[in-house]
Amino acid sequence: MLPDKGWLVEARRVPSPHYDCRPDDEKPSLLVVHNISLPPGEFGGPWIDALFTGTIDPDAHPFFAEIAHLRVSAHCLIRRDGEIVQYVPFDKRAWHAGVSNYQGRERCNDFSIGIELEGTDTLAYTDAQYQQLAAVTRTLIASYPAIADNMTGHCNITPDRKTDPGPAFDWPRFRALVALSSHKEMT
């Protein structure tokens, strides 16, 4: 799963136009976990790809009319079945965090990687999603070691606006999978 010029080899690539360059000499040092479902609470359709590529049809669902104007992206999406979709290379700045602050640092998009989990705040995430998120995180830590100590939810960097990944996300389970996997690789 090693990155190929910022792309995961095993991910399905759906390049987004919604990204730009990070500030000079800025390497990713933060992982931000998000959730998304389009329409809200529905899974498996083409709508997340459409949102992140700027091609969502505002007439396809009433909710889409509210979001069709957005220019947003994440680096990756992990679907319910564990499929990884990548929209933006990791060395580029995806537009996932918005107005944000992490430990006193503003503009989290400048120094973070955003990974979306297909889901909602209150529905349990799947085992496949945890396994893939841990695998991607290990890969990221190998290239960007500071991420090991800086993993958070969207809700923690934008607490007045966002709630994801929500109470359904099992942080201890995720951190244990990352640690267990990292330990296996060292032995």
Curated annotation (Swiss-Prot):
Cofactors: Zn(2+)
Record localization: Cytoplasm
Domain N-acetylmuramoyl-L-alanine amidase per the UniProt entry, residue ranges: 29-167
Catalysed reactions, semicolon-separated: Hydrolyzes the link between N-acetylmuramoyl residues and L-amino acid residues in certain cell-wall glycopeptides
One GO cellular component term: cytoplasm
UniProt site (Transition state stabilizer): 162
Keywords from the named record: Cell wall biogenesis/degradation, Cytoplasm, Hydrolase, Metal-binding, Zinc
Domain of life: Bacteria
Enzyme Commission number(s) from the entry: 3.5.1.28
UniProt-annotated binding residues for Zn(2+): 34, 154, 164
Function: Involved in cell wall peptidoglycan recycling. Specifically cleaves the amide bond between the lactyl group of N-acetylmuramic acid and the alpha-amino group of the L-alanine in degradation products containing an anhydro N-acetylmuramyl moiety.
NCBIfam families attached to this UniProt entry: PRK11789.1 (NF008758)
Family: Belongs to the N-acetylmuramoyl-L-alanine amidase 2 family.
Protein name stated in the entry: 1,6-anhydro-N-acetylmuramyl-L-alanine amidase AmpD
Organism: Salmonella typhimurium (strain LT2 / SGSC1412 / ATCC 700720)
The gene coding this protein: ampD
